[in-house]
Swiss-Prot record:
PROSITE patterns: SSB (PS50935). This is Single-stranded DNA-binding protein. The gene is ssb. It comes from the Bacteria. GO terms for cellular component: nucleoid. The keyword Nucleus does not apply. Residues 108-188 are annotated as: Disordered.
């Protein structure tokens, strides 16, 4: 039977990305991403939060983009896979480290993440390890320039108008900014 190793995270960076370059010249970025679950405590009735921290690694152009555009507090969508590495510490003890190896990323919120107040919601800010052509960004010299704005696509006219507002499986507004295929289905 086939197996699946797929991770999807939507969270915030706990620190600026750490970007290094391998001898081959390829970039490697390490990120710490926090995800927070909110739940109601059955005993007290209070809303509580549980935060999980995730180590995320990126390679190549995706790592360069993360290093250039992400900052502490940036909200980000990540797709990737779980990888566990085994290594030995100075005393020879075996240690294990579990991380997510990202192959897709989309920056959420305004340009520059939580540190900038300006919103740039009409801009395509997604990058993919699998399709380098879509991840290509012109490298500005000296100063960052905002990407060109895209015009929103007009929905096809099917004669139902805004009928989908009442459909229970319509895409929730909370998922705005998360990459979907052209037909509206999520990329799983």
């Amino acid at each position: 039977m086939a197996s699946v190793n797929k991770v999807i995270l939507v969270g915030n960076l706990g620190a600026d990305p750490e970007v290094r370059y391998m001898p081959s010249g390829d970039a490697v970025a390490n990120l710490r991403i926090a995800t927070t679950d909110r739940y109601k405590d059955k005993q007290s009735g209070e809303m509580k939060e549980a935060t999980e921290w995730h180590r995320v690694s990126m390679f190549g152009k995706l790592a360069e983009i993360a290093g250039q555009y992400l900052r502490k507090g940036s909200s980000v969508y990540i797709e990737g896979r779980i990888r566990t590495r085994k290594w030995q510490d100075q005393s020879g003890q075996d240690k294990y480290s579990t991380e997510i190896v990202a192959d897709q990323m989309q920056m959420l919120g305004g340009r520059g993440g939580a540190s900038d107040g300006d919103s740039d919601s009409g801009t395509d800010r997604s990058a993919s390890q699998q399709s380098p052509a879509s991840a290509q960004r012109s490298a500005p010299t000296g100063q960052r320039q905002p990407p060109a704005r895209r015009q929103p696509a007009q929905p096809p006219s099917n004669g139902f108008g805004d009928f989908n507002e009442d459909i229970p499986f319509a895409r929730p507004a909370a998922l705005d900014g998360i990459p979907f295929r052209n037909d509206g289905a999520p990329r799983y």
